[in-house]
Structures are given as structure tokens and as C-alpha cells.
Amino acid sequence: MRLTPHEQERLLLSYAAELARRRQARGLKLNHPEAVAVITDHILEGARDGRTVAELMVSGRAVLGRADVMDGVPEMLHDVQVEATFPDGTKLVTVHHPIP
């Protein structure tokens, strides 16, 4: 299978998010990269499902809570920005303060 660099990046991100979700299911708190991967994957999959940028900006803040991540992670994550492919093209989705 041959993948473009963009496709490789998306696949790696998807795997990182899946690994983070498995760790979360075992009761572990997520670190910074794991939290970013889960939120980013939520946005990419939401765009693929046809949700709007506005919907994803709101729902991206509900993916994880403070109880889901290690101490200090919410303070490190000011914004998560993702270029997602929507049915009408690629758009930048910004989630401000993704872990309220």
C-alpha cells in the first residue's frame, strides 16, 4: 500500500488517538500528545461525517474533561487547530480552550 505523506500523517494520528482511547479505557489519564490526538481525531472524523466547522468547534470542547487528562495538560492546551476535509473542501477548525 502506498500512502502520500498527508495520508501517512492522518493514519499515524488516528492510531495515536486509538491508543490514547485504549489507555483512557484502562483508567489512565492522558498526557498532552494523547489529548491532542483524541481531539484532533474527533474533528477529522466529524468533518468526514459531514458536520460543520461551527459544530466541531463546539463539540471539540466536550471530548475531554479535566478528569481525563494529567495535571497541567488543560493549561498547556490553549487551542487545537486542524485542517479538516469537508464535503465542500478543506477548512481550518480551531477549538479554543479544548479542555474546559
Swiss-Prot record:
| Sorted UniProt keywords | Cytoplasm, Hydrolase
Keyword Cytoplasm present in the record's keywords: the answer is yes
Among Pfam families, the record links this protein to: Urease_gamma
Q: Which GO BP terms sit in this record?
A: urea catabolic process
Q: What broad class describes the main subcellular location of this protein?
A: cytoplasm
Q: From which residue to which does the signal peptide run? A: none
- Quaternary arrangement and interactors, per the entry? Heterotrimer of UreA (gamma), UreB (beta) and UreC (alpha) subunits. Three heterotrimers associate to form the active enzyme.
NCBIfam families in alphabetical order: PRK13241.1, urease_gam
Concerning its family, UniProt says: Belongs to the urease gamma subunit family.
Q: What is this protein called?
A: Urease subunit gamma
